[in-house]
């Protein structure tokens, strides 16, 4: 046991601790992984830590012109500073009335998760006001908020807001404080303008909505009834007629979940402008219905409905399937149909943005996620293609081959192709009737290259959100993907062309953005401020887009990371700026070649190798630790017995086991002593990570030092000090300077180990067994006893 304890102390002293992974290296392994504590230690992230009694945070609007971000949660509207979300946040407490909450509970809803005012819509009304809607405890309500820079509260109420109470609200609206005058620079809610939120905000907070406020008209994909069965795309407010999709028509919408809405112009003619909705729904055309399909739908902004048919209903609504699949060698595709999030990356041409979408697989047998990219050219080609039509003896879906009415269904009035028609009410009845029965396009929209950009299969998480940033590096422009997961982490990914057919995915980092893991709900990015803002049920976090110092202190580490944000400046890995005049900045994102980029700096790579000394006993085991900074590096172990010998590579044998953490040597032999070097190779760049000098001790020598014969040991003379511990005798026997470190560690170890009660100094001795006997109880005692 003492021999094993000596080996354990030596292993702890040199930092070696064996670990046995259960699986091989997985693809898409992050180069840097940071826990929430480690992320905070970098000073590049901040968590919104005001103690509000609320949950379900959603980032609903980013206003970079005013440096504000507007967040909705249960019973609160927050206005946060984009530079620092904890700096003077503006808070409005907007709760449902107690009577409404009581009615909600009586209807069978949960008092905490459903019977509250969950803010789900914040849209810019004009330069001074916001339009805000909440579920209102299953009674949707909307009003206007003055977007000021100061809170409508006295210092006392501001303190209460920080503690979680905020400004008092009555009957679902904020009561104005009499001490705070209503001025333009005050952030306050206008209760006198409270109105119904039906058709704007869902009743159920678990149902998502997608909305856009355009020209003071609100377009929203939403469920409009208490039971959550009537879904529609609505147009409310404004001067035009209120519009919606055809009610209870499964060909139009079939149990949809709305994800995103985006205005994308078709041409220079404003009458051609269309609003695109991204959603998923149960499909009627699937071979094995019901199945969930991802959809993209669109409507014309100047749609007024039909004259006799489709009155006050969209007469230009069309939809198509979004396909995100991995083609197999046998021609069978693996589909990801559950659309989760959409990010629209603007380009110099406002008519042709790039669409990024996150998908997950349906069902529980196959668990996976994917990111697909779509072009507007492909989307428009599908909407200009054939319509889906049911015909034939089997009543199956076919492309419509009959006579197409004029104007083509889905064309906007007064646009490029219909300049003489000023309204959809001027369309012939045959066009309106065709639209009612043929809203679906026959062809589907496929991603670029007809394959996903990023795929995750077999991972213990699913992707939930996406944000994309364009970064100018020394060798070109790159798109950096930030992917949120249902584990509360954010992954930073770039995808590079490997050859003509394949792409190479690099996960630069994965960080935990919340102290308590929770699925990422919403995420927005500010390229101007180089910040990412992430929201979940537990709070809001904003973090920098780059942490260059986390890649390492060497030029090779910085270059091998291939992060477009970072470059070697001659001293450290720091933020790359295209306008920098320093000639020593080294960056190579496309190839990551430190041999070419880091000339003059690579000599320091081997000097930074960790050197240590370990001891082992023949017949036992030893673990040599080696963890390269990059998980993509190839690790090799080299052995050199004596300084003049040639180094040879250690290959996997019965006695040698290579793990992700190092090298395990089993059944040590005296011939195993020597210098072990762990080298890491990545992109043809090789450097030494660690060197371990291993000393193998004979079992007989160790046993003789730890257990000397009794005849040789004489009783200590009077007045002598405490006897020398056996391990110290072993150190004196070996006469090696490194063994003094083991003695040092052992002394410190025994100093901190609490003594047992029997050996503790000053502890009362336990009584003898005869003293512990219970005395016999005599009934009659002498008086003087």
From Swiss-Prot:
Location, primary (coarse class): secreted
Entries under SMART domains matching the protein: IG, IGc2, PSI, Sema
Q: Where in the cell is it found?
A: Secreted
Q: Which Pfam families match?
A: Sema (PF01403)
Q: Domain Ig-like C2-type: where?
A: 605-690
Q: Where is the composition biased (Basic residues)?
A: 775-785
User: What UniProt keywords are attached to this protein's entry?
Assistant: Disulfide bond, Glycoprotein, Immunoglobulin domain, Secreted, Signal
* Residue ranges of the region described as Disordered: 752-785
- Tell me a GO cellular component: glutamatergic synapse
Q: Which domain of life is it from?
A: Eukaryota
Q: Which GO MF terms does the UniProt record name?
A: chemorepellent activity; neuropilin binding; semaphorin receptor binding
Q: Which cysteine-cysteine pairs are annotated as disulfide bonds in the entry?
A: 104-115, 133-142, 300-412, 324-372, 548-566, 678-746
Q: Which PANTHER family match?
A: SEMAPHORIN (PTHR11036), SEMAPHORIN-3F (PTHR11036:SF27)
Q: What is the documented function of this protein?
A: May play a role in cell motility and cell adhesion.
Family membership: Belongs to the semaphorin family.
Which named protein is this? Semaphorin-3F
Give the species: Homo sapiens
- The gene from which this protein is expressed is SEMA3F
């Amino acid at each position: 046991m003492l021999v094993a304890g000596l080996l354990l102390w030596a292993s702890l002293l040199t930092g070696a601790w064996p670990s046995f992974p259960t699986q091989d290296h997985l693809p898409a392994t992050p180069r840097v992984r940071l826990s929430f504590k480690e992320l905070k230690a970098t000073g590049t992230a901040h968590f919104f830590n005001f103690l509000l009694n609320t949950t379900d945070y959603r980032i609903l609007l980013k206003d970079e012109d005013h440096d504000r971000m507007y967040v909705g949660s249960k019973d609160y509207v927050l206005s946060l500073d984009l530079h620092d979300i904890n700096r003077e946040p503006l808070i409005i407490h907007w709760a449902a009335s107690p009577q409404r909450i009581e009615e909600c509970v009586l209807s069978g809803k949960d008092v905490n998760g459903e019977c509250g005012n969950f803010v789900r819509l914040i849209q810019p009304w004009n330069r001074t006001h916001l339009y805000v809607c909440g579920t209102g405890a299953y009674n949707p309500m909307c009003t206007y908020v003055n977007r000021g820079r100061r809170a409508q509260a006295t210092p006392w109420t501001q303190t209460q807001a920080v503690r979680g109470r905020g400004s008092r609200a009555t009957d679902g609206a904020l009561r104005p404080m009499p001490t705070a005058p209503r001025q333009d620079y005050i952030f306050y809610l206008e209760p006198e303008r409270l109105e119904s939120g039906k058709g704007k905000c869902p009743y159920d907070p678990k149902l998502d909505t997608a909305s856009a406020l355009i020209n003071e008209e609100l377009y929203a994909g939403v469920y409009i009834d208490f039971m959550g069965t009537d879904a529609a795309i609505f147009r409310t407010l404004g001067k035009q007629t209120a519009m919606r999709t055809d009610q209870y028509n499964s060909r139009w919408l079939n149990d949809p979940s709305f994800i995103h809405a985006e205005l994308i112009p078709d041409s220079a003619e404003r009458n051609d402008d269309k609003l695109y909705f991204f959603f998923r729904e149960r499909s009627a055309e699937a071979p094995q219905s019901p199945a969930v399909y991802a959809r993209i739908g669109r409507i014309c902004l100047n749609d007024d409905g039909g004259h006799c048919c489709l009155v006050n209903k969209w007469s230009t609504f069309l939809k198509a399937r979004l396909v995100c699949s991995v083609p197999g060698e046998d021609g069978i595709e693996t589909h990801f149909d559950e659309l989760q999030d959409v990010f629209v990356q603007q380009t110099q041409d406002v008519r042709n943005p790039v669409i990024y979408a996150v998908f997950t697989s349906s069902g529980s047998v196959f668990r996976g996620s994917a990111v697909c990219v779509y072009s507007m050219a492909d989307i428009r080609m599908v909407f200009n293609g054939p319509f889906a039509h049911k015909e034939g003896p089997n009543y199956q879906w076919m492309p419509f081959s009959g006579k197409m009415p004029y104007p083509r269904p889905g064309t906007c009035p007064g646009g490029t192709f219909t300049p003489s028609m000023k309204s959809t009410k001027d369309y012939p009845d045959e066009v309106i009737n065709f639209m009612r029965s043929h809203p679906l396009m026959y062809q589907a929209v496929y991603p670029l290259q007809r394959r996903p950009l990023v795929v995750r299969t077999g991972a213990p998480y699913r992707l939930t959100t996406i944000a994309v940033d364009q970064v100018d590096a020394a060798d070109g422009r790159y798109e950096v993907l930030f992917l949120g997961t249902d584990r509360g982490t954010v992954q930073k990914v770039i995808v590079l062309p490997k050859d003509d057919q394949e792409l190479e995915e690099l996960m630069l980092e994965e960080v935990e953005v919340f102290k308590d893991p929770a699925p990422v709900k919403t995420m927005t990015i500010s390229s101007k401020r180089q910040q990412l803002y992430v929201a979940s049920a537990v709070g809001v976090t904003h973090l920098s887009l780059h942490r260059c110092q986390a890649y390492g202190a060497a030029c090779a580490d910085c270059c091998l990371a291939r992060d477009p944000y970072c470059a070697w400046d001659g001293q450290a890995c720091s933020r790359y700026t295209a306008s920098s005049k320093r000639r020593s900045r080294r960056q190579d994102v496309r190839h990551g070649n430190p041999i070419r980029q880091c000339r003059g700096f690579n000599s320091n790579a081997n000097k930074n190798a960790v050197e240590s000394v370990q001891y082992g006993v023949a017949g036992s085991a030893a673990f040599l630790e080696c963890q390269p900074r990059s998980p993509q590096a190839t690790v090799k172990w080299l052995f050199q017995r004596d300084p003049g010998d040639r180094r040879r590579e250690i290959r996997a044998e019965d006695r040698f086991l290579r793990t992700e953490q190092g090298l395990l040597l089993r059944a040590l032999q005296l011939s195993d002593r020597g210098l072990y070097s762990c080298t890491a190779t990545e992109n043809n760049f090789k450097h030494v990570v660690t060197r371990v000098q291993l000393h193998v001790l004979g079992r007989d020598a160790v046993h003789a030092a730890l257990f000397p014969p009794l005849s040789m040991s004489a009783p200590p003379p009077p007045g002598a000090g405490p006897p020398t511990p056996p391990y110290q005798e072993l150190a004196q026997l070996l006469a090696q300077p490194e063994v003094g470190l083991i003695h040092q560690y052992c002394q410190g170890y025994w100093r901190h180990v609490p003594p047992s009660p029997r050996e503790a100094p000053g502890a009362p001795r336990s009584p003898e067994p005869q003293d512990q006997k219970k005395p016999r109880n005599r009934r009659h005692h002498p008086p003087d006893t």
